[in-house]
């Protein structure tokens, strides 16, 4: 029943948000076009449910000539690839709003383990090598936010310890999922965004 409620919530919330935010999303698209040449949206292949590859949508925040389509090259502070508008979009997480379309289409969920690019590494090791149970996190749809993000585990995972901490949170979520937990994560994410700062 919890999974049925989760999908119903995903459809209702993503469709409502897309309709309400449509004028704002169009305004952001215009700013991106005026700021730098290239497409408004950026598509990237990432892990989906049951280890199926999915295309995830984001507002383009980087220069097209320097963009890493694979997503393996993680973003760092003061990254020279990021455009002026892109810096604002990433800092406020507005760049991720197009993922509402992924949620509506059933590729993603509002809450779940964050979708990783295929071939992610930390300390030179693939995530699958760092944590043998890594792919268990893909038993559920990836989310726009998750337990790890609520706990403030953000930014580049350049060290194995950082990657393991996030994956541990993801595995805990998959093993203990409930609709009540999802509501707590949504509330906790909002609090975390307001108190711990934004991304880059």
Swiss-Prot record:
Pfam families: Bac_transf (PF02397). Signal peptide: none annotated. It comes from the Bacteria. One of its GO terms (biological process) is polysaccharide biosynthetic process. GO terms for molecular function: phosphotransferase activity, for other substituted phosphate groups. Keywords: Exopolysaccharide synthesis, Nodulation. Belongs to the bacterial sugar transferase family. This is Exopolysaccharide production protein PSS. The gene is pss.
């Amino acid at each position: 029943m919890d999974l049925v409620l989760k999908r119903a919530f995903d459809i209702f919330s993503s469709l409502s948000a897309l309709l309400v935010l449509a004028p704002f999303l169009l305004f952001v698209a215009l700013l991106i076009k005026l700021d730098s040449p290239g497409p408004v949206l950026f598509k990237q292949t990432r892990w989906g449910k049951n280890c199926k590859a999915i295309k995830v949508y984001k507002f383009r925040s980087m220069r097209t000539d320097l963009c890493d389509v694979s997503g393996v090259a993680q973003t760092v502070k003061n990254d020279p690839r990021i455009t002026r508008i892109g810096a604002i979009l990433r800092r406020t997480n507005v760049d991720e709003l197009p993922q509402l379309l992924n949620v509506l289409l059933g590729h993603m969920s509002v809450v779940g383990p964050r979708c990783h690019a295929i071939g992610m590494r930390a300390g030179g090791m693939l995530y699958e090598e760092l944590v043998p149970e890594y792919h268990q996190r893909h038993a559920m749809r990836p989310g726009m936010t998750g337990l790890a993000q609520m706990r403030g585990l953000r930014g580049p995972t350049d060290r194995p310890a950082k990657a393991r901490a996030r994956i541990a949170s993801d595995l805990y979520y998959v093993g203990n999922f409930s609709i009540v937990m999802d509501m707590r994560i949504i509330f906790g994410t909002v609090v975390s965004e307001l108190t711990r700062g934004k991304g880059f």
